[in-house]
Amino acid sequence: MINTQNFIYTAETTPDLSTNLSNSVSKIDPLVGLADAVNITDSPNCNTKLSSILSAAEIKKKGLDVILQLTGRDRNRIALESEMLGALSIDVNK
């Protein structure tokens, strides 16, 4: 859990366009122990990528906090609410 009393270090990653989750998540291995959290982008530049929620869940297993991005550009309110419920159901909430 991020300590709000100190300066925090974050990094950003973009999931791959691949079904190989371990390759996408292994990019952050060097950050474990260095970064406090990882910001996970959500299909930047209108490009299809692996789910940011799925990537966030796997990164949390490595002991890093995640900052999940959800873009509203290609989703309506119901789709965004479904994404948030999915994230909460797999403990991507802090």
Regions found by a protein language model. Name each.
Residues 1-94:
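Domain-level signal for soluble alpha/beta catalytic cores
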